[in-house]
Design a protein with these regions (language model features):
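Acidic-basic catalytic patches of nuclease active cores, encompassing PD-(D/E)XK
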Residues: 1-31
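Domain-level recognition of nuclease-like catalytic cores that cleave nucleotide substrates
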Residues: 5-9, 82, 88-137
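Amphipathic alpha-helical interface surfaces
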Residues: 14, 38, 68-72
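Active-site metal-binding core of divalent-cation-utilizing nuclease and nuclease-like domains
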Residues: 25-47
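Conserved catalytic cores of phosphodiester-cleaving nucleases, focusing on short active-site segments
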Residues: 42-44, 48-59
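Active-site-adjacent loop/helix micro-motif of nuclease/hydrolase catalytic cores
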Residues: 59-70
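Arginine/glycine-rich "motif VI" loop of SF2 helicases in the C-terminal RecA-like domain
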Residues: 74-81
Length: 137
């Protein structure tokens, strides 16, 4: 399966996960990466929160261009949404990171990897408010 098809499949998986939760709905922005205008992969909400989510998936480390993060910030601010990066690595559940918790690459770009999402990310259930995980210092 091509990485583009896999990414689209996982975006749809996350889309359906939100719809299965009572009170949550959303939409997938088709072709979000092919426009010059800021557009996240998913926009979801529950009447009190709106999330703009850029999805990343794969086997290991994923690099994220500074421009993509900047566009997510712009969109979220204009739309009144919280900006999040959703990450689904092979054999791992979805994890979500706030933009300030992304890893910094050389230059001005960012990255996510499995170690980073486990240490700095939150799981789907925490994102939607089912529980709040306490972290040990």
């Amino acid at each position: 399966m091509s990485s583009k098809k896999k990414g689209s499949r996982l975006e749809r998986e996350l889309f359906h996960m939100f719809w299965k939760q009572k009170g949550w709905c959303g939409l997938r922005v088709a072709g979000s990466g092919s426009t010059t205008l800021p557009a996240p992969d998913l926009i979801v909400g529950n009447g009190s929160r709106v999330l703009a989510i850029e999805c990343k998936s794969g086997k290991g480390r994923r690099d994220i261009k500074k421009e993509q993060v900047d566009e997510l910030k712009i969109f979220a601010k204009l739309f009144g949404a919280e900006p999040w990066i959703g990450v689904r690595f092979d054999n791992m559940p979805w994890h979500f990171l706030q933009l300030e918790k992304l890893g910094k690459s050389k230059g001005k770009n960012y990255f996510v990897d499995s170690k980073l999402v486990v240490s700095n990310g939150i799981k789907f259930e925490e994102l939607i408010g089912k529980y709040k995980q306490k972290r040990l210092s």
